[in-house]
Amino acid sequence: RVRDALERVGGVHLELPPVLGAESPLRYRNKVQFPVSRGKCGLSIGFYRPRSHDVVDTEDCLLQPEADTALRLAFKGWMEDFQIPAYDESTGRGLIGHLYIRTNRAGEALCCVVANGKELPHTGELSGALRAAVPKLAGLVLNVNLRDTNVILGDAYRTLWGRDWLEEELCGLTFRLSVPSFFQINRDQTERLYQLALEFAGLTGEETVLDLYCGIGTISLCLARLAGHVIGAEVVPQAIEDARANALRNGVTNAEFFCGDAG
């Protein structure tokens, strides 16, 4: 497909290098967003059926860490025990829309409950159930999304227990990730990708590099070790806050970040 786009659409003819595949195709994803629904078969927390918004309850997903399954099952048990209503897209009623989980290389997990309301009942019982399922739970966050939209996350967040971030190491740097932070799903492949990009760039230490759509600054800070100066731009305010904090955390002084539309 890439070759076809380059040759047929772009009129560019070149030899493509071999694909650098992952060492393991299993358990590599560091983030998951489970939709929640209650239908004829009861409460379902899993994934959408192809080409639909029907939620299929899943026993496991081999692309996710085992901690994700443990947290999903504990969350489902909490909803059943306290009869917490799932959000219904057709009526706009109900409370729980999604369960969001982020994990890091150290085995920690950050859970976010996406709700159609500003309050979540029985939060003490929920945090206890999640911590029992995964002792390395770092935090539990409530995201409020009152809009009738396909966008999963709303704009308002509240920490219910623990902290609202994880730290992750990438290419020898440490990054703080909040719930809305963009971070590549496959850590190991991301490191290979960034290292290859740095080789292709052939930086000498004199360049000023622009990193558009920079997210939390992962590529920017990797480039900064070899470039003279790096400027990152991103439209998401929280991501820019994270990028600036990550630069300070890693002692990078030749990178600056601006919030704005890079397009």
Regions found by a protein language model. Give the residues of each.
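SAM-dependent transferase fold signal centered on methyltransferase-like domains
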Residues: 1-158, 170, 195, 199-206
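Rossmann-like S-adenosyl-L-methionine
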Residues: 122-263
